Amino acid sequence: MYIGIDLGTSGVKVILLNEQGEVVAAQTEKLTVSRPHPLWSEQDPEQWWQATDRAMKALGDQHSLQDVKALGIAGQMHGATLLDAQQRVLRPAILWNDGRCAQECTLLEARVPQSRVITGNLMMPGFTAPKLLWVQRHEPEIFRQIDKVLLPKDYLRLRMTGEFASDMSDAAGTMWLDVAKRDWSDVMLQACDLSRDQMPALYEGSEITGALLPEVAKAWGMATVPVVAGGGDNAAGAVGVGMVDANQAMLSLGTSGVYFAVSEGFLSKPESAVHSFCHALPQRWHLMSVMLSAASCLDWAAKLTGLSNVPALIAAAQQADESAEPVWFLPYLSGERTPHNNPQAKGVFFGLTHQHGPNELARAVLEGVGYALADGMDVVHACGIKPQSVTLIGGGARSEYWRQMLADISGQQLDYRTGGDVGPALGAARLAQIAANPEKSLIELLPQLPLEQSHLPDAQRYAAYQPRRETFRRLYQQLLPLMA
């Protein structure tokens, strides 16, 4: 048996995995986010630990944990958890979706002109390094007391094992890691007036970083089992769905849309707002494009058009008048990350006439989200990734009609697989399983999810969509000056 813990933003999820790789028990505990000022997003690390402790005890009530061999941790990335020399938390953790430090991003890139080469990424307010610069500038008395900086899941590890440790995939999201070398960058740390001594030790995702402290093991009804490094949420989620080898790729359609592709070497294209991070598996990296509003656009449009829900919206789109002039939708309801890196980007309908009604608007929304997802996929492929097929997961991927439309727009074979909703906790448990079974291959331990349906792009429809995609791109560029 193996345990996977996923420290999310809205809750902690813990799962129990058997030797066959099946989830036999799961528990979730809710978390809340504090927003004391505009753009701020914070959580109390003590809340993380209390929720994890409750979830683990509930899991133990559901199923004996005596046979657990190892435990893995995944979690929300980028959060800045600041500790003093007595391991006390100095202030609430500043989360990945906190937007206060845009100025510090500009300042850091000016201080280290080669930062994009070292980190493989554009400096963004979500990342950890600019948050520390903000603390130094606005809370100097707190900054002076910092002994260690930990990422959210690694604070849980400290409470479980007493060890200061992190994994490569999560560390890559700090902007302090030399992503190609898989080591801390002294240049990036010095730019924030920090040193290696204030950073956790680095491990690969399936390496053991320590063991459960006796008092924690006793409280959870377990042995003092090894704890593995684990991974950031996206990398751990990818491990869970079997994204192991170079050129394997997955498209996750949730509130946001994430396109994740594995590479065997370090590739980057920071100017396109593609994230380039280490994978949670050794000698592997990954590229990731992020669309901020994917399935959330469908929820919004269903309400806007008076349709009861997303399935009704998709049914309406299928009834759209084929002879009507096309309508375009720019799906930037929360700004956009890849490829525009523009928090000021806005949503737009364009091309409306008296011919158009709710059905045509519904179709435009599905197509517009598809065009934006394809833009994100294209910039990842431009880095040198060549997937044969793309695994499609997430709640937004349930519609067969929309899945086929996405294949036709992108020109990619899309393989819809079920079971991806377990999320990063599954990847964390599988990383623990790898550590406990060194004699077994990754292919054996990390199978792909069951295939439900493959969607091949229709050549005719693909050809018809390309000029519309070009208009979609031109629309954004033409409207850009008005979006500031």
From Swiss-Prot:
InterPro entries, per database record: ATPase_NBD, Carb_kinase_FGGY, Carb_kinase_FGGY_CS, FGGY_C, FGGY_Carb_Kinase, FGGY_N, Xylulokinase
GO MF annotation, one: 1-deoxy-D-xylulose kinase activity
Source organism superkingdom: Bacteria
Keyword Kinase on entry: yes
Important for activity (site feature) positions: D6
Pfam families xref list: FGGY_C, FGGY_N
Enzyme class (EC, first level): transferase
Regulation (activators, inhibitors): Sugar binding is accompanied by a dramatic hinge-bending movement that enhances interactions with Mg-ATP.
Residue numbers binding substrate: M77, H78
Gene3D superfamilies: 3.30.420.40
CDD domains, sorted: ASKHA_NBD_FGGY_EcXK-like
Active site residues of this protein: D233
Mutagenesis or variant effect for D6A: Loss of activity
Function as written in the Swiss-Prot or TrEMBL entry: Catalyzes the phosphorylation of D-xylulose to D-xylulose 5-phosphate. Also catalyzes the phosphorylation of 1-deoxy-D-xylulose to 1-deoxy-D-xylulose 5-phosphate, with lower efficiency. Can also use D-ribulose, xylitol and D-arabitol, but D-xylulose is preferred over the other substrates. Has a weak substrate-independent Mg-ATP-hydrolyzing activity.
UniProt subunit comment: Homodimer.
Protein name: Xylulose kinase
Gene source species: Escherichia coli (strain K12)
Annotated gene: xylB
